[in-house]
Amino acid sequence: ADDDLEGFSEEDLKAIKEHRAGLAA
């Protein structure tokens, strides 16, 4: 669910997704 990502800019979303990918790795 990406509902908690509402309000973030496209750059913020990219950084968040990369951060989450790093945590999951």
Swiss-Prot record:
Expressed by the venom gland. GO terms for cellular component: extracellular region. Keywords: Secreted. It is found in: Secreted. Coiled coil: none annotated. Its main location: secreted. The keyword Secreted applies. It comes from the Eukaryota. Unknown. Is not toxic to mammals. Elutes at 29.62 minutes. Belongs to the non-disulfide-bridged peptide (NDBP) superfamily. This is Toxin Tpa3.
